[in-house]
């Protein structure tokens, strides 16, 4: 089956943040027309292969790391540029990136047709193991249990990690369950959760071999 072009570009400017996001759910070439960055903050979350382009610049290293993992294992191409009020804290940057990513995902996905709709993913990272289940249901709901104990990982507040996932489910209008089943290192617990979510999303948006809406209602989103 030939996929529709599932791409989107989102620009969001507020008094707190400036964000630009380009996304393609099936990888390939993407670009941002006019960069808002004077220069890249870091090359840590930057990767270009024959099938994906990923460049994440939020100013928060651990957030960049998590977004990079999500994009890589979802099969997305993703460019994120963000200038946030980090002199205050990480809240607005994380929240507004989340808003932009959710908007971009929903816009790129478009009508839910010809896809599996449901996705399940497991991902280990050393001692940590996480599970994610996704339903492209148009019924936003999230149950998140990561069991994080630290206040921060790098410069990212741990309370913002489940908040981002809950907000993603609400704005993207998906049902989302993400659990870290075991693990004692909060970095590993978080990263395995984002990777499990990526695996689940990749399955949910993959072709089911038809052009049908995967619902007894005949419509989703």
Curated annotation (Swiss-Prot):
The keyword Lyase applies. The keyword Lyase applies. It is an enzyme of class 4 (lyase). Keywords: Amino-acid biosynthesis, Histidine biosynthesis, Lyase. Coiled coil: none annotated. It catalyses: D-erythro-1-(imidazol-4-yl)glycerol 3-phosphate = 3-(imidazol-4-yl)-2-oxopropyl phosphate + H2O. Its EC number is 4.2.1.19. GO terms for biological process: L-histidine biosynthetic process. Gene3D superfamilies: Imidazole glycerol phosphate dehydratase, domain 1. One of its GO terms (molecular function) is imidazoleglycerol-phosphate dehydratase activity. PROSITE patterns: IGP_DEHYDRATASE_2. Pathway: Amino-acid biosynthesis; L-histidine biosynthesis; L-histidine from 5-phospho-alpha-D-ribose 1-diphosphate: step 6/9. Pfam families: IGPD. Belongs to the imidazoleglycerol-phosphate dehydratase family. This is Imidazoleglycerol-phosphate dehydratase. It comes from Kluyveromyces marxianus.
């Amino acid at each position: 089956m030939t996929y529709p072009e599932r791409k989107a570009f989102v620009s969001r400017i507020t008094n707190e943040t400036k964000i630009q996001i380009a996304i393609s759910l099936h990888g390939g070439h993407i670009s941002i027309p006019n960069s808002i960055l004077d220069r890249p903050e870091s090359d840590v979350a930057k990767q270009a292969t024959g099938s994906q382009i990923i460049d994440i610049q939020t100013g928060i290293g651990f957030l960049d790391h998590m977004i990079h993992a999500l994009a890589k294992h979802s099969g997305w191409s993703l460019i994120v540029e963000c200038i946030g009020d980090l002199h205050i804290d990480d809240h607005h940057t994380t929240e507004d990136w989340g808003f932009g990513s959710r908007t971009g995902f929903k816009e790129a996905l478009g009508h839910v047709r010809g896809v599996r709709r449901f996705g399940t993913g497991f991902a280990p990272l050393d001692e940590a193991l996480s599970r994610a289940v996704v339903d492209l249901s148009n019924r936003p709901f999230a149950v998140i249990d990561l069991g994080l104990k630290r206040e921060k990982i790098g410069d990212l507040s741990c309370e913002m990690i489940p908040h981002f996932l809950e907000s993603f489910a609400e704005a993207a209008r998906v049902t989302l369950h993400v659990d870290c089943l075991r693990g004692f290192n909060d970095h590993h617990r978080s990263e395995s959760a984002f990777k499990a979510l990526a695996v689940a999303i990749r399955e949910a948006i993959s072709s089911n071999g038809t052009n049908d809406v995967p619902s007894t209602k005949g419509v989703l989103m």
